[in-house]
A protein has these predicted regions:
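Structural preference for solvent-exposed beta-strand-turn elements
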Residues: 1-202
């Protein structure tokens, strides 16, 4: 069977952390994951696994320890709201303007996004689990972004933010620091009239 091991990821990866976590919970002995991803989804996965009988410690930090167990049990579990989905709708609302309320969100999971939407010209009003996005006659302003591992700006919202910046006054610089070839949407935006110049990762 599988045996616990110490694993150091060469770079931060959500998918790699999740796969190692899922495998380690049923391995014999202790597994330690170094340079692990810290995203909310990692914490949520660990919480779910622990509810099922796993022994996961340190999720949400760069070092996760897992003590293998012989079996897991079924549970009822509600997953965390999807922050990328929330961010996509928020950016869509800010882009087209008007007044849109998003419910069942985790504000803290998108801490890097909200200030940038406000800098771009939208007004945000938060309640406990909702946000109201408003932009009427205010013109969008150019904002620069750098994608980063959590809690930085999510690479999965880079294309949506770029789309909003296509309608902004001024020049925006968008740097993609997570994935190569993550500007595949640029030619399509250019076909629709956007003025985009891609140079390497920006």
């Amino acid at each position: 069977g599988l045996k616990g091991a110490e694993i150091t990821f060469p770079f931060i990866s959500v998918g790699a952390t999740e796969h190692a976590l899922l495998t380690a919970v049923l391995a014999d002995g202790e597994t330690v994951l170094n340079n692990a991803a810290c995203e909310p989804e990692i914490i949520d996965l660990a919480d779910c696994l622990n509810a099922m009988g796993a022994k996961v410690i340190g999720a949400g930090t760069s070092r996760i320890s897992i003590i293998g167990v012989s079996s897991l049990r079924g549970v009822d579990y509600s997953v965390v709201p999807d922050r990328i989905e929330a961010g996509t709708y928020a950016l869509a609302a800010a882009t087209v303007g008007g007044r849109v309320k998003l419910s069942n969100i985790c504000k803290d999971h998108l801490g890097a996004l909200w200030p940038l939407i406000e800098q771009a010209g939208a007004k945000l009003t938060f309640n406990k689990t909702s946000v109201l996005i408003e932009r009427n006659s205010t013109k969008l302003k150019a904002v620069d972004i750098d994608t980063q591992a959590y809690p930085g700006f999510p690479t999965d919202l880079q294309a949506q933010f770029m789309t909003m910046m296509c309608l902004a006054e001024g020049t925006s610089i968008i740097r993609e620091n997570i994935f190569e070839n993550r500007f595949m949407h640029c030619p399509e935006l250019s076909r629709m009239g956007a003025d985009i110049d891609v140079r390497g990762r920006e």
